[in-house]
Amino acid sequence: MFTGSLVALVTPMHIDGSIDWQALEALINWHIASQTQAIVVAGTTGEAATLTLDEHKAIMRFCVDIANDRIPIIAGAGANATARAIELTLAAYHCGCAASLQVTPYYNRPPQRGLYAHFAKIAAAAPLPMILYNVPTRTACDIALETVTALAKITHIIGIKEATPHARLAQIRQLFPKNQSFKIYGGEDALCAQAACEGLIDGVISVTANVAPEAMQNMMHCALNGDLKQAQAINQRLAALHESLFCETNPIAVKWALQRMGKIAAGIRLPLMPLDERWHESLTAALVAAGITIQTH
């Protein structure tokens, strides 16, 4: 299945907030050339919360068409309404996505039995591989280890993305030893090199890969193949970038960085805002430290 560096892709937008399809196509081709292992579209970093249902489905179709079997497209298809998540997952299946990423239902804070029923019903609706997504800092909802264990027995549920501390990754790995079919993906760029070196994750679903795709893939390849020294060296070069990309709520900073690189326009949808000027200098310095070419104003 999917290992290494998977990018949590931004949704490029024009200044008026409309989707920039030309820029999206260019980003997909750039990630293919950079050997990114899969692209997650219309997820948190892709501003799924402010996409219309039609836009969400159109992004899935467009990315699958542009990828043309050159790279797997994973659809962000999660929702806090089970019926909507099923609708998005069916759309992802029918347009040819390789898998779906399913965030825990946010805001309504279901009990563990509700989480199990939610994901089980989605898995039953479409024969599409599913990756669970646990990000309690955003959702106010945490999947218990017992619930993960139960869900992993369902045929189409193939892994989990954990945007959680190192200790939780270690607990998940104890449940699912390496080389099993159930995969573990890190969701915190700053932790992924160490976690991969320790064998705790099989890949990362990365924000940093938006701006440094080749470096992230090289780092993960080294970490997963025992070249720990080189993995740590690459991670050290990216350390300031990992931090700076979260100086404000994701994807504010990463979209600004991509704009400075000349990859996308400055569009972002309310209630998110363009990056506050007080962060411009530090993020620019982090990009330069990572060896990334930026455009001068």
Curated annotation (Swiss-Prot):
The domain of life is Bacteria
Positions that bind pyruvate: T45, I205
Q: Which residues form the active site?
A: Y133, K161
> Which spans of this chain does the record mark as coiled coil?
none
Pathway it belongs to? Amino-acid biosynthesis; L-lysine biosynthesis via DAP pathway; (S)-tetrahydrodipicolinate from L-aspartate: step 3/4
Pfam families noted in UniProt: DHDPS
In chain numbering, where does the site feature Part of a proton relay during catalysis fall? T44, Y107
Q: Where in the cell is it found?
A: Cytoplasm
Quaternary assembly: Homotetramer; dimer of dimers.
Q: What does this protein do?
A: Catalyzes the condensation of (S)-aspartate-beta-semialdehyde [(S)-ASA] and pyruvate to 4-hydroxy-tetrahydrodipicolinate (HTPA).
Q: What is this protein called?
A: 4-hydroxy-tetrahydrodipicolinate synthase
Q: Source species, please? A: Dichelobacter nodosus (strain VCS1703A)
The organism's taxonomy opens as: Bacteria, Pseudomonadati, Pseudomonadota, Gammaproteobacteria, Cardiobacteriales
